[in-house]
Amino acid sequence: MARVVPLDSASEAAATLSGVRAQLATVWLGAGGVLDLLLITVLAGGHVLLEDVPGVGKTTLAKGLARVLGVAFNRVQFTSDLLPADVLGGSVYHPGDGRFEFVAGPIFTDLLLADEINRAPTRSQSAFLQAMEEGQVTADGVSHPLSPLFTVIATQNPIDFDSTNPLPEAQLDRFLIATRLGYPDAAAERSLLGEYRSAPPLLPMLDPAGLLRLREQARGVFLHPDLAHYIVALARATRDDPRVRLGISPRGAIHLADAARARALLHGRSVVQAEDVRALLHPVWDHRLLPRQGREHDRRITAALLDELTAGVPLPR
């Protein structure tokens, strides 16, 4: 029988996460919902895709998240000449003693910013995303495990598609959440020009062991069978409509359940509620749904279609 998180433990976790969020808010002046989605991704042990234009704070946010969580951070700029070994690492031959040594690449970290992932060659994308999914890098028949905290924040520009290789549907499905940061409001943008630059340095609110405990707590949040049936019904509603080329996969349903558990813990609850599922429907599923008509990368089209497809699924009583 699965261990359920006690209510007092959930409240303590929420208090800790509130401190993390408050620290991040000193360097991120945009919508607060983005911070929640990043924390949900980390708690659920998933990966996030940020689809946004340059200059809106993606790198600052990723570095800040790693700092506040107390985990290691690396950044890789994906380019058209990037090789798999540039990210994963590989074996180096030492002629002096005739041996090979594995040299770890930047993927061997806790939090990795994969910047402009759609600019890399498809071979490099595939190798990276396979390692991301499997949690290990295999070289010369030897598997090298990644960090148990390994989390990817990948970015791609939704406007500039010249010389890019859009991620295939099967690879998009590996991201727990896809979202956009958006531009800050006028007041926040004015702050960027002034007092924001003198903000105090971020303080670590967690360490790797503490973050692992929070992930374990998130897995222990109770999902009622009725809500599990509801998630399955939502996913199945996307699969048999003539307007849909590709509906939500079983992995997408699992990801929604995992994210809902993480959101419940973020709000200090030991039980998932229907509002957790509904609040995460678009961040978890919009990038997985592929309509037959319209531009594949236009999330407005997929969001509207997802609303229509799931509107008739009754909430559990």
Please give the residue ranges for each predicted region.
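Conserved AAA+ ATPase small/helical "lid" subdomain
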Residues: 203-256
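C-terminal engagement/docking regions of AAA+ P-loop ATPases
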Residues: 2-7, 240-317
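AAA+/P-loop NTPase substrate/partner-engagement loops
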Residues: 68-96
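Pre-Walker A (pre-P-loop) alpha-helix and adjacent loop at the N terminus of AAA/AAA+ ATPase modules
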Residues: 10-53
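Walker A/P-loop
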Residues: 39-79
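Canonical AAA+ ATPase core
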Residues: 94-99, 116-124, 132-208, 212-221, ...
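P-loop (Walker A) phosphate-binding loop of NTP-binding proteins
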Residues: 53, 87, 155
